[in-house]
Amino acid sequence: MAPPRNVVKIAVQMRDAIPQLIQLDQAKPLAAVLKEVCDAWSLPHSERYALQFADGHRRYITENNRMEIKNGSILCLSTAPDREAERLLRGLQSESREGRREALRHLLLLAPDLTFAREVISRDGLQRLGTIIEDGDDLGEVLALALRAFLELMEHGVVSWETLSIPFVRKVVCYVNMNLMDASVQPLALGLLENVTLSSPTLGQLVKSEVPLDRLLVHLQVMNQQLQTKAMALLTALLQGATPAERKHMLDYLWQRNLRQFIYKNIIHSAAPLGDEMAHHLYVLQALMLGLLEPRMRTPLDPYSQEQREQLQALRQAAFEPEGESVGAGLSADRRRSLCAREFRKLGFSNSNPAQDLERVPPGLLALDNMLYFSRQAPSAYSRFVLENSSREDKHECPFARSSIQLTVLLCDLLHVGEPCSETAQDFSPMFFGQDQSFHELFCVSIQLLNKTWKEMRATQEDFDKVMQVVREQLARTLALKPSSLELFRTKVNALTYGEVLRLRQTERLHQEGTLAPPILELREKLKPELMGLIRQQRLLRLCEGTLFHKISSRRRQDKLWFCCLSPNHKVLQYGDVEEGVGPPTPESLPEQLPVADIRALLTGKDCPHVREKGSGKQNKDVCELAFSVSYDHGEEEAYLNFIAPSKREMG
């Protein structure tokens, strides 16, 4: 006869004792279960003991998580978390260096468990760790262990980062600024300061004032990839916490110190593979660089500004007045105004007063900046573009100003200028770190592409929107290839002619239509069982291989990873935390299990609980697209295993 549904067969281990094989009644209070286990081994005071999972992080069993115990689970009897916390915190005060080190090692092993972490925190464990960190008596392994344990306990969110004292933060800053510091300490100190900066504006200002940018540049230029990554993380955190004016000043200084060139040559093109965390921080840095353009993008032209009127005249003169000559010399004021208005229309402005075209935001003054940059950095190409089109009388002229304004809007949209940084994205473009004035340089390539495409399409003014759609497709397809330099981008985008775009569109349309043709549908129905079998086999194989996922908190992107895979017999999902840079773990080494039979449903997008919790801001759009959750039976309640796919390809 099969046991009741709420009874599971498990093994319980204890050091130097024969394991017990018991039937655990999940309806029985945990205290009663513990007493029975202790009685079987003749152990008094069962309240001094607790059950833990025997593998992985050895999490304590509580009334909240006991339903995770399944048939075949192996548990171990250990000291209760409150008593273990007391013992280890006493060990931190040991006069023996070795005693303190052993206590820290054990504390670090148990710190990921929330039950244990709460016991430590309630006994002033964070303050005791803080004392070790502040005293700095041992700048080697003991300090590194204390920092790691402190970070692990804070990660639970039981205590706010804003509660940290100024002297404590200053001491951690000292470890970052010190020379000849232990290599294991500084990445941890940088990681702690990153958390502080992202969570507390007040303490973030302290970190900003105490950690010189030059010191972060030193850390970025080391060969230690972990130290390099953590330095970049703190740098992007400081930039995110700065005001727009401060951010511009900081980035200008970093660029003067050749940080851009160093990133391009020594990080992006390093022999070592670029880690996911570094890729995310480079994405954030790129977004902040492009974000400097937002004020110009959102500022309309002021018709009463003398400087802006002069810039418009410089644009006109560069196209129609040879150097040192003035076409309007000797003309009356009315004739000169009439001539200027005609030349502005030839330049491609819709109004004889060009200020009216640039009142639209976006792109505002950013479009004027782009046009001026093109006219000054590529004067021959600029003159050729304008004169070639202004002299045509067959209605096929390409309006330079109108095209530039719309192209600036398009580029801002494709590059998400002014949008908040995503918590998960790693989508940076290497070419933005390989070029000064990268946005304006990209505009110069793109405006010449637009003129080329206009001629290939033999477009007229009525076709303007169609041309912009084609140019958008050309730019989007090429940006998606992530070319490593602007020259490579130029080569690839110019190879994507209007004819090639049409061919790609036709291929995609034929593929879509072909799959719907009656003979194809009939053949598909015949092959469907076999195809479904192959698809099922391939997907099961992919699930068994497993995937690395990032842990995402409600506050920020985490650098922690976890791995999930399907067991070889397809009956259990196995998962657990892993370290970055370590190869995929074996299924047997993963501590957590979820029987497939307990799974209720698969949720995606906005239906996922971790997406609903994060709200609907722009920065969470990509999170929504990559989110999925597995709901499963957790006793009488429904629980969730939440995921953020590494990419849209993996999501598909």
From Swiss-Prot:
Chief location: cytoplasm
UniProt superkingdom: Eukaryota
Domain ELMO: 307-479
Localization (cell): Cytoplasm
UniProt keywords, alphabetically: Apoptosis, Cytoplasm, Phagocytosis, SH3-binding
PROSITE patterns per record: ELMO (PS51335)
GO molecular function: SH3 domain binding
Pfam families in alphabetical order: ELMO_ARM, ELMO_CED12, PH_12
GO BP, one annotated term: phagocytosis
UniProt KW Transport keyword: no
One GO term describing the cellular component: cytoplasm
UniProt keyword Cytoplasm, yes or no: yes
Subunit structure comment from the entry: Probably interacts directly with the SH3-domain of DOCK1 via its SH3-binding site. Part of a complex with DOCK1 and RAC1. Interacts with ADGRB3.
PANTHER family per record: ENGULFMENT AND CELL MOTILITY, ENGULFMENT AND CELL MOTILITY PROTEIN 3
Record function comment: Involved in cytoskeletal rearrangements required for phagocytosis of apoptotic cells and cell motility. Acts in association with DOCK1 and CRK. Was initially proposed to be required in complex with DOCK1 to activate Rac Rho small GTPases. May enhance the guanine nucleotide exchange factor (GEF) activity of DOCK1.
Name assigned to this protein: Engulfment and cell motility protein 3
Protein's organism: Bos taurus
Gene: ELMO3
